[in-house]
Amino acid sequence: MDKNATNYPLSVSMPQHCAYVVRDLPHATVEQRERALNATHWNEFAFPSGMLTVDMLSDSGTTAMTNQQWATLFLGDEAYGRNTGYYVLLDTFRDIFERGGEKNWKKVIDLVRTDCRDIEKMMDEVYLCEYEGGLFNGGAAQMERPNTFIIQQGRAAESVLMEIVKKILAARHPGKVFTIPSNGHFDTTEGNIKQMGSIPRNLYNKELLYEIPEGGSYEKNPFKGNMDIEKLEQLIQGVGPENVPLVFTCITNNPICGQPVSMANIREINRVAHKYDIPLVFDVARWAENCYFIKMNEEGYADKSIAEIASEMFSYCDVFTMSAKKDGHANMGGMLAFRDRGLFWQKFSDFNEDGTVKTDVGVLIKVKQISCYGNDSYGGMSGRDIMALACGLYESCDFGYMHDRVQQCEYLAQGFYKNGVKGVVLPAGGHAVYINMDEFFDGKRDHTTFAGTGFSLELIRRYGIRVSELGDFSMEYDLKTPEQQAELANVVRFAIDRSRLTKEHLDYVIAAVTELYKDRESIPNM
């Protein structure tokens, strides 16, 4: 035995957490589940969660929060105006997305957690701090030029953004139809774009997405969520830059099987968008997962922390919307922010002839936020949820936690693949495993059958496992143009809750899907 050794490696991973509370699962029968399916019109979203064995419908808001988060719930300030959590949350975002890594964090949340009674210190370090020029104005700048908006979830942030953009574009260009490209619009983003009368486009490499190397393993992640830069250039030139008001990037690329986006690709998207004077909008529900993939797979980032990578990544966007119910490691929360006096502000504000501001787009967004969701101090969130979110954002920067999470996804995907299930998208993303329904059914089900929905409902009926169909049915294949149909990934998603599922759950799902695959011919169409 080497007494001087400082490390004793094992062939298994070190546990990342332990359970404080457990919930017993129901034992519903096939007959009971079928009765419930009939009663809910065979709608996977309407099926009672209390009758499920494993619920993988979404990873949004389903997190098992940490003991630190539960503790901060008790520190929630429910004041209507400028609750303490407002200051803490905005500075948490500055810490992680702007300050370049842990060594530069202020972490003012610790002043609240330690019950700081020094009023002068709280005024100087929390309440009266002035910030401008970035994504999170503070103090007088946030009041004069609001650019940061707490909203209770991501789709609401998208809705506020797109409603204001729609209003501005309609006033300037009545009747004009715009095109908004992305590497992959999620269904809510696509819905919000359609509601503003614009055309959503998904520009990614579909052939690469479904490609699998022999043996099912890549040496390095190929970043299948990347935007196809050539297609982006062609689209902008084809429709004209004046007809593309925004370029979106989904990070990680949820509709395209949760695949990550490389930093090199993000830089290129930024370059192309700014070349044509178009603001770049990030949809960053899973920002931390994407930073993990960059760290593990992209040259030059191995020695950087998740927070350091996040600071660089966010430096390339003009606007971002976030559902913080994912990588906020929380059950509720969202954010909309744009760069102070940046390209989005310049393009969508109105100015007088002398250059002074006539209408500030941030003020329009703030009015919408307050009229629909509540005072800008809380944006529809409770004070306790704001504090839990601030704590959770730091939790998502922990490499050990994130590594464990991504490995859970890969374990599930490899379990399907090794059991011969066709259509598994590899490598797995950071939040879910996806199966290509076209390949699963051997190309025998056309797009009018909505077989992915049939698959998801049969999985509920037989085994009490709920997943999300994110293909032909939910993305409205039959209502799309031929171009849009070609861009659609006909998949179902097995979302993995944060810090909640065990290997036992995953093994049960692997066994169930394997058996269903063997009997796939009997799965009914919709």
Please state what every model-predicted region is.
Residues 423-495:
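Conserved PLP-binding catalytic core of the aspartate aminotransferase-like
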Residues 38, 44-66, 418-426, 453, ...:
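Anaerobic metallocofactor- and corrinoid-dependent redox/one-carbon enzyme cores
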Residues 2-41, 59, 69, 81-88, ...:
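Conserved PLP-enzyme active-site core in the AAT-like
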Residues 46-67, 79-91, 477-480:
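A structural motif shared across PLP-dependent enzymes of the aminotransferase-like
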Residues 252, 344, 442-451, 499-508:
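Short, conserved charged micro-motifs
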Residues 72-76:
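Aromatic- and Gly/Pro-rich donor/ligand-binding loops
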Residues 410, 414, 453-461, 507:
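Feature representing long, continuous alpha-helical segments
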Residues 100, 171-172, 396-397, 474-526:
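PLP-dependent enzyme catalytic core of the Aspartate aminotransferase-like
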